[in-house]
């Protein structure tokens, strides 16, 4: 999520693009292990992905593992510097946004080739945009550009010049291209031909992804040395945090991109120089109920989950202060809503974290006919309130939170069954079979700007997790959010955008489709073997400058 002014000139400082990714571990936030031998360069950076990447197609990315690979391999027209939060030239050496906010013209660098040697030109940009905006592709990245109905027009002026015109104004248009990895229009390797610093060299399902230095990468450092410095990056697929920490301590991996607070404190006690706390992050942990009409759950339970009073009551009955204190050892704060207070411009300061009150929760439930019967909460038809919460196995923080939520809700007569699943099984239930009642996961905010959240809040989106891909909004409040999100996305007036997105946050607070729990600090661990790492709060926190990292013994 990102804040700041809306910029229309090529090098204007710009807020990062806020795209919410459901982390594989969705909660886990990807990892990267970086190594470094600063002077000599070379070496291998070793790190872990906390789940299997769902795709290598950069236009279809919606999970954290795939996003990490896209970031490391994809070449973009403009890149948001994760440290300064300013836009910097990428494959485009300059660009200009039209005054009406509908168009953008790029001047591309010449003499660049994809990793397989295929020349890069404006044709590839046009092809990428056409694919990105194709409704049949269902690109989560493309959702950020959908501010109005109609087709996108691309005009190739020369091999190094292209203009793109959208049917309606798109706020922060230049910034959004930070997430658009350009794909080749002609390479037989399709999306596996890349323009970023690394290329996928090997993939062993369930085990690892090996990235190697892209020999055709166009960047050099200030001394004229070709980037990246690293020869390779080995990404091990490892969901178990205990194993990950053990491997870090043994020196088998170089970096932990998102460190649990328990591990942070333990490592800080013995090796304080290896831990980094960048402060409050943009990411959140939350739970939600399944409201999908075709989900294989009893109708009476779906009625509970679709009730605003039920969702609000569950939220009121959860002790967020305890979650922050016990689970995160003080390295977290109770969440207010979809925007972290660390996102200073876009955060709605009028909202306050839900106060813990079992009494208020019971009162709210009574409005829907729920009642306590010998310590058991029942609905008006006599059905005992029982549901399961699923979360990803191996994530100790989530597992502990689920148990604490179970204990909190027991105080109002609700029986919660906690179920842990491997991440692929969880994702399948969440996105394919809809065979679940409630889910506890995390949300990663890639940018500060609400435009990056279009794929989360639009009712038609497949990332609208509680009830995705609605043909038309099924509730008045979702219709209002659709309208507000499109309005802010098509406005060049920062004050009007802020007003619209403040209202979105208020609706989400009132309706509680997501029950936001905590915002955790950006904690990471970096091996002394890694040189050049400067962790930040924006994704990818530790390896945002991977092309400049070095790894050594």
PLM regions and their residue ranges:
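N-terminal secretory signal peptides that target proteins for export/translocation
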Residues: 1-17
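Extracytoplasmic/periplasmic ligand-capture domains
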Residues: 4, 79, 83, 105, ...
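Bacterial N-terminal signal peptides
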Residues: 18-32
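Surface-exposed binding/hinge segments that line
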Residues: 22, 40, 107, 141-187, ...
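Sec/Tat signal peptide C-region and signal peptidase I cleavage site
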Residues: 33-39
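Cleaved targeting-peptide boundary
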Residues: 39-45
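N-terminal lobe/hinge region of extracytoplasmic solute-binding protein
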Residues: 48-99, 130
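A structural "hinge/loop" feature
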Residues: 51-68, 91-93, 118, 141, ...
């Amino acid at each position: 999520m990102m804040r700041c002014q809306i910029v229309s000139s090529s090098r204007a400082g710009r807020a990062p693009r806020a795209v919410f990714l459901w982390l594989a571990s969705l909660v886990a936030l990807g990892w990267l292990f970086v190594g470094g031998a600063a002077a000599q360069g070379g070496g291998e950076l070793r790190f872990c992905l906390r789940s299997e990447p769902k795709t290598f197609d950069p236009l279809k990315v919606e999970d954290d593992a795939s996003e990490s690979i896209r970031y490391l391999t994809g070449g973009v027209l403009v890149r948001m510097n994760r440290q300064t939060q300013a836009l910097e030239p990428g494959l485009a050496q300059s660009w200009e946004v039209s005054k009406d906010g509908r168009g953008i013209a790029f001047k591309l660098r010449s003499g660049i080739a994809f990793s397989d040697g295929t020349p890069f030109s404006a044709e590839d940009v046009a092809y990428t945009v056409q694919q990105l905006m194709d409704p049949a592709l269902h690109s989560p990245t493309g959702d950020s550009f959908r501010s109005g109905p109609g087709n996108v027009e691309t005009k190739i002026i020369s091999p190094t010049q292209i203009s793109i015109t959208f049917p309606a104004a798109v706020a922060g248009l230049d910034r959004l291209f930070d997430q658009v990895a350009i794909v080749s229009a002609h390479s037989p390797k399709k999306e596996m031909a890349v323009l970023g610093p690394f290329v996928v060299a090997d993939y062993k399902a369930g085990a690892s992804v090996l990235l190697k230095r892209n020999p055709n990468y166009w960047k050099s450092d200030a001394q004229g040395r070709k980037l990246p410095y690293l020869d390779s990056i080995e990404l091990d697929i490892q969901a178990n945090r205990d194993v990950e920490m053990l491997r870090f301590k043994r020196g088998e991996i170089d970096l932990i991109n998102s460190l649990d607070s328990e591990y942070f404190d333990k490592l800080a006690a013995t090796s304080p120089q290896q831990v980094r706390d960048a402060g409050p992050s943009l990411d959140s942990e939350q739970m939600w109920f399944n409201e999908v009409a075709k989900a294989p759950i009893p109708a009476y339970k779906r009625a509970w989950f679709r009730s605003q009073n039920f969702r609000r009551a569950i939220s009121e009955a959860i002790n967020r202060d305890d979650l922050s204190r016990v689970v995160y050892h003080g390295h977290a704060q109770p969440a207010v809503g979809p925007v972290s207070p660390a996102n200073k411009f876009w955060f709605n300061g009028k909202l306050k974290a839900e106060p813990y009150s079992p009494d208020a929760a019971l009162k709210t439930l009574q409005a829907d006919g729920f009642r306590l019967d010998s310590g058991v909460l029942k609905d008006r038809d006599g059905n005992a309130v029982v549901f399961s919460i699923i979360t990803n196995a191996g994530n100790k923080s989530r597992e502990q939170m689920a148990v604490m939520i179970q204990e909190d809700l027991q105080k109002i007569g609700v029986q919660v069954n906690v179920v842990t699943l491997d991440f692929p099984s969880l994702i399948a239930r969440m996105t394919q079979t809809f065979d679940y009642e409630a889910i506890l996961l995390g949300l990663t905010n890639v940018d500060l700007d609400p435009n990056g959240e279009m794929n989360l809040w639009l009712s038609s989106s497949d990332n609208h997790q509680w009830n995705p891909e609605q043909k038309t909004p099924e509730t008045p409040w979702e219709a209002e959010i659709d309208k507000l999100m499109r309005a802010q996305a098509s406005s060049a007036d920062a004050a009007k955008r802020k007003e619209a997105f403040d209202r979105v946050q208020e609706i989400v607070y009132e309706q509680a489709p997501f029950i936001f729990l905590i915002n955790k600090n950006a904690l990471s661990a970096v091996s002394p073997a890694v040189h050049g790492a400067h962790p930040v709060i924006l994704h990818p926190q530790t390896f945002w400058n991977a092309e400049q990292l070095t790894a050594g013994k």
